[in-house]
Amino acid sequence: MSEVKMFSEPVPNVPWQDRPANDNHDAPIWRYTENPIIGRNPAKGVARIFNSAVVPFEGKFVGVFRGEQVNGIPYIYLGESEDAIHWNINEEKIKFVDENGEEFMPIYAYDPRLVKVEDTYYAIWCQDFYGAAIGIAKSKDLKTFVRIENPFLP
């Protein structure tokens, strides 16, 4: 296998599981044998969690998650974990605000990703905005998420 280089700060508490003996592909990562780690009905009104995006933050892990509600409509939820295996999912959807501090909630939001650039975290997701579009928000503290204008419109 080729050498893999990480371009990030060390994360000493990242959970790790050795490659399963029966795994015969050359990918640099493999699925955790206990997947899924978040079961059904993880928070009030949320039937399932999909497509999470997790970052280390202040000695623990924080993630943004597609929380599919019991009515089938997905929204973005925040979760925290000490070990990146056992998660506490907030019961409230992330309450996005615009740059003036006004509530600005996506109607239908799914498949979030989370990335840190310098001192700011950016959440990016797919959403319905008069058709399929990309949503984006920024946060310094992973508590307040400020929506940025949609970078790509339908």
Predicted regions and their residues:
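Beta-rich carbohydrate-recognition and catalytic domains
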Residues: 1-107, 115-154
